[in-house]
């Protein structure tokens, strides 16, 4: 993507995390040499996709209005290195990314975050670590607890949501990462695509922990099955357990018929 009048675009910017893993980001920023507030989106859904650049916030309009917009692939997603374990790495990775931003000569020291669903989760999780430069978040349609209300419901594994989300959004769409980082052969990619087209057949596979499709490429799915109870694995990443540690302005956005409405209300009340 080329520069637009008044907007400078920089692609595939490497940002190293505390453990040496590199995450990649794109920047939309005003042309000039000033210092600007920064709006950050951290996504598992491909930072270069049109909806990442324009659904929650129009990146070009924001840059023309005097903001820097950074969109980053989460760990293990698309071009970013590492292995993707939903939620687990977003606390430190969010903190490290915000610290990196705050140290750039184009940042005025103020960072905000935006986006919904999993992208909303990355905001709450980053805020839990209290990076000094983070001043505000706008999490939309996301949960307060990733055990009850996301992965489990009343003690039952949310098979429909978990399987479809993992297979369609997190694995099949991540072709380049599967090939480069996991060495997945073409027939494996074809197998996953076929499964995504016939999900109803996959729902009937028993036992759940023996479902072979995600072995070695989406091990988080099996880790969720290993933690059916609300144990320390879940508590460490549960927003509602850490509201007292979140000291930034938060605009919570929900929908009355959204699956995460309960979590949206809990986060609002908890703050």
Give short role names for the model-derived ranges.
Residues 106-118:
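Alpha/beta-hydrolase fold nucleophile elbow
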Residues 30-103, 151-152, 157-159:
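Cap/lid segment of the alpha/beta-hydrolase catalytic domain
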Residues 262-271:
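Active-site-adjacent alpha-helix of alpha/beta-hydrolase-fold enzymes
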């Amino acid at each position: 993507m080329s520069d637009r009048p008044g907007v400078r675009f920089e692609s595939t910017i490497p940002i190293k995390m505390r453990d040496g893993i590199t995450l990649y980001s794109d920047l939309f920023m005003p042309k000039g040499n000033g210092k600007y507030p920064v709006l950050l989106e951290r996504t598992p859904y491909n930072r270069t996709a049109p909806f990442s650049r324009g659904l929650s916030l129009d990146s070009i309009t924001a840059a023309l209005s005097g903001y820097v917009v950074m969109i980053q692939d989460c760990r293990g997603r698309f071009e970013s290195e590492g292995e993707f374990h939903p939620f687990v790495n977003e606390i430190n990775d969010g903190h490290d990314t915000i610290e990196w931003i705050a140290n750039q000569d184009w940042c005025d020291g103020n960072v905000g975050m935006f986006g919904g669903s999993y992208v909303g989760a990355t905001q709450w999780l980053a805020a839990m670590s209290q990076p000094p430069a983070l001043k505000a978040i706008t999490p939309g349609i996301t949960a307060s607890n990733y055990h009850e209300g996301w992965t489990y419901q009343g003690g039952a594994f949310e098979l429909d949501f978990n399987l479809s989300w993992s297979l369609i959004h997190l694995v099949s769409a991540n072709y380049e990462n599967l090939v480069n980082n996991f060495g997945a052969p073409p027939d494996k990619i074809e197998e996953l695509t076929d499964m995504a087209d016939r999900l109803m057949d996959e729902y009937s596979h028993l036992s759940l922990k023996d479902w072979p499709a995600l072995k070695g490429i989406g091990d988080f799915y099996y880790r969720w099955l290993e933690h059916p109870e609300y144990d320390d694995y879940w508590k460490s990443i549960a927003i509602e357990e850490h509201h007292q540690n979140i000291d930034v302005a938060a605009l919570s956005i929900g929908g009355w018929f959204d699956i995460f409405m309960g979590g949206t209300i809990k986060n609002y009340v908890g703050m």
